Amino acid sequence: MLYDAIVIGSGISGGMAAKALVDARLHVAMVDPARDSRLRDRIPDKPFRELRRTDADQRSYLIGDHLEGIPAAGVKVGAQLTPPRQHISRGADDLLPSQSETFFPLLPVSLGGLGAGWGAACFTFDASELQRMGLGGADLAPYYQRAADLAGISADPGSEANGRLWQGVGRHQPPLRIDTNAESILTRHLGDPSRLNQRGMTLGRIPMAILSEDFDQTRRANPYFDTDFYGSVRQSIYRPAYLIETLPADRFTLLGGRLALRFEDKGDEVLVHSRHVETGVFETHRARRLVLCAGALNSARLALHSLGLVGVKTPILCNPYTYMPTVNLAMLGREARDDCHSMAQLGGVLRHDDSDGVYGCYQMYSYRSLLLFKLIKEMPLPPALGLLVARTLQTSLAIFGIFFEDQQTDSKHLEVLPVAEGQMPVVRFDYRQTDSEIGRQRRHEDRFASGLRSLRCFPIGKVDPGKAGSIHYAGTIPFENPFDKRFHANPDCTLAGTRNVYLGDGAPWNFLPAKGLSFTLMANALRVAERVVAAS
């Protein structure tokens, strides 16, 4: 069959691109391993504390039947993934092989991609950020609104954080309730905003792709059960799979269980060569247009391999990320309400120390349903004492994670290695920050920690989960490639050297702002899909 378009990838970008193409009456196929786990659907629709008291099957989703929810040692990328979410990357080492000594990304093989476990925070990029990314001429405002309409966003129009994080989206749901811990922090900040403002920081409720009101008959308002890291929670958190499942069968085909290996642009059609992950059978699918939404790292793998550019280096962008567990003194000895959601409660930005731009973007989580053992294993204390301390501090623990901007340098790149016909090429990653970048990040971390202390949230550590730990990847097929001019994105988001291959994810970006990229990935995918429709 000759499809109008094939979308490779089912994640944050792929879901939105497929939706826009199908809505335009195109016949669309999606190629993706699309592995899924229904463990999340076995979790009773009850509050976390009640499940801990009464559910005899809680082991299966809290720590896993094979203890897979207990990391063996250290902090690794994806450590926050609970057993019901670990299918996201299960088997990726075989399906998406890589080599590195410096960069160990989370590579998804699941239905929904990384969107099957994302944090749901949604931010808009401003004109200066879009300019640096290579999207200076793009008006994303209507696409941001369309993405919000499709995903379901809850936002507080009066939040101080909006000035840098949320502009131009008029329609959204009311804000979510925040938990007791966050309320105490926000109350202290609002009593004297100058404490943070003089340090170049803002703080407030942030937009979240979590429903505060029912969306339709399937996706319902978040019940504040504090089980969001485990179950589907009435589908209240947007996942790409929920959107994909609504696409009409007469115009959309999910070619699940397939691993795209390479493509060929023949001028009047594109051939997508894939392998069935279970049977090993090779297949070729045909379409007039191809939209790469495999995620920046895998889109680059496919494109380099398909163009025969073995050994050619291309940039990597990835937000550096640090999180700081803190003790909120206002909550010591206080009880916290049980009714809360598990995701980020508050957030804000940290301005550049030498300009007015945003250098860091942070979110605050309470430490409740992720279980104390994950905290105890990071404490420099004997386990019994660590447990006692953790129980004492539990309601007062506030985890602040901060992301920093990233830009191209000579020491951040990937390349594909030679491979036999019909095999997935190995990607070699190398990601090393320059001394200047490291120094700047440390200065901003110190100022950030000072701001937290002014809120009476005292850091008890600083954790670096690794150079791929933010799980924010972009910039691998940039508009401007400093490594090799042959491998880049054209201004219309087609892949250089092809006529019918479009880049629908974050691979073309020249720069990665500190703000979470997922909401802009959604909007950009809708924009690129519109171009595909216009060319069809």
Q: What are these model-predicted stretches?
A:
Residues 90-92, 221-232, 256, 261-265, ...:
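A glycine-rich dinucleotide-binding beta-alpha-beta segment and adjacent secondary-structure elements
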Residues 376-458:
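C-terminal catalytic lobe of FAD-dependent flavoproteins
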Residues 2-3, 280-289, 293:
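Core beta-strand elements of the Rossmann-like FAD/NAD(P) dinucleotide-binding domain
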Residues 511-529:
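A conserved FAD-binding loop/helix module that cradles the flavin
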Residues 262-284:
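Conserved beta-strand-loop-beta-strand element in the redox core of flavoprotein oxidoreductases
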Residues 35, 47-84, 289-296, 300-400, ...:
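Mid-to-C-terminal "cap/lid" subdomains and adjacent gly/pro-rich loops that border
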Residues 2-132, 136-137, 310-329, 334-340:
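N-terminal glycine-rich phosphate/pyrophosphate-binding loop and immediately adjacent elements
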Residues 55, 62-84, 98-100, 104, ...:
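Conserved redox-cofactor binding core of oxidoreductases
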